[in-house]
Amino acid sequence: MNSIALGFLVINKPAGLTSHDCVNRLRRIYGIKRIGHGGTLDPAVTGVLPIAIGKATRLLSFLPSPKTYEGTIKLGISTNTDDLTGETISEHSWDQVKENSILNCLNKFQGEIKQCPPIFSSVHINGERAYKKARRGEFFELPPKLIKIYRIKLINWNKKDGTIDLEVHCSPGTYIRSLARDIGKKLGCGGALAKLNRTMALGFNIDQAIELPDLDKNNDLNKPMIIDPLKALSHLPSIKLMTIDELSSWRKGKHLILSKSRLKNPLYLIEDDKDIPKTFLTVINNENHLIGLARWHHEPFKIEPKIVFNADG
């Protein structure tokens, strides 16, 4: 049995593989079935793919949800997939586009906006993925979804090639392909996503990312170091259970009334992230091992077990 209990990896996903391909390879390398990823990337997209190992799959929803991308938009072309892998629908000149008009356009997309997902996407329609209906040539429209663009920044404008390089910091559920399409429409010439790299997801950034291990070198030296889940959850407050009675009650899923003064990092905020409830904390034992997550309540201060791991560490 593999000795890994729980933790995270950050993979720098290469182009050409699905997120599930990466998970399958890691399952074979580690000999563990319980491995999941935190946020699907299209095969052509590269960059940060957070991987949860073992019981850490239960922690994914407690990680910070905003994501950051660096992408390139090709102006003058519209496709059925909203990127350059699709069939061309129309082509137009971008000669009239100037840098100031791009900056003004990008400003209109900052904040909360409604966005229609691409028809070639994994959105469900009556129990079926949208891309399956699109492949059959069916005509349909997807309803707009409310998303949030926290930051959108112009990195470079190449007038000759008609390409816009930009950085986007956004809420989950944002389609950068749709953003490329809509920016092209507002600029009056159409646009499609040419390239995309995710540089941050679930609190992990590209500097932490490693290359996907090679299956042909399946040995202990080839297994990347697992990131301690407490590091991934450092945005949450923490409390330590110190007595046998406290640990016993925790194992049994009982509420514990404790002193609030035992809280570590009690004043915390997750900026612009409404997806993580502000009432959760990590629970550790005397060896500083994560033994679960709890919901905390005021007056009296008590913790209610939400996720319980082995209290022995």
Swiss-Prot record:
Pfam families attached to this UniProt entry: TruB_C_2 (PF16198), TruB_N (PF01509)
UniProt KW tRNA processing keyword: yes
InterPro entries: PsdUridine_synth_cat_dom_sf (IPR020103), PsdUridine_synth_N (IPR002501), tRNA_psdUridine_synth_TruB (IPR014780), TruB_C (IPR032819)
Role noted for this protein: Responsible for synthesis of pseudouridine from uracil-55 in the psi GC loop of transfer RNAs.
GO molecular function, one term: tRNA pseudouridine(55) synthase activity
EC number(s) recorded for this UniProt protein: 5.4.99.25
Keyword Phosphoprotein: no
UniProt catalytic activity: uridine(55) in tRNA = pseudouridine(55) in tRNA
Family: Belongs to the pseudouridine synthase TruB family. Type 1 subfamily.
Top-level EC class: isomerase
Top-level taxon of the source organism: Bacteria
Keywords linked to the UniProt accession: Isomerase, tRNA processing
Matches recorded under NCBIfam families: TruB
PANTHER family attached to this UniProt entry: PSEUDOURIDYLATE SYNTHASE TRUB1, TRNA-PSEUDOURIDINE SYNTHASE
Catalytic residues as annotated in Swiss-Prot or TrEMBL: 42
Protein name from the UniProt record: tRNA pseudouridine synthase B
Gene Ontology biological process terms, A to Z: mRNA pseudouridine synthesis; tRNA pseudouridine synthesis
